[in-house]
């Protein structure tokens, strides 16, 4: 089953990390992705630019509303994702717990709905 790991981080805390600390996070994430790829479980993933680079689009009463930044003002913002294919939720949780940012941030595990919406 496919799962999306949504990696949310506190952007202010991320900005305070040293270059070495950030490289440690990136290196650990790359190592995990390489391991999952070798097992055929890694489908896609990438870090995202800061939320200040985001654009939100909404349609209200037939009108397009475009705003700079994320839709919600929260401390943690979506900072990256991993799409994995594993047998079950327990395996997805085990992988999410190995994402380096899980130690200081949040990794949301969400099953991917396949096929037409029901």
Describe the role of every protein-language-model region.
Residues 1-118:
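Conserved, structured core segments of small domains
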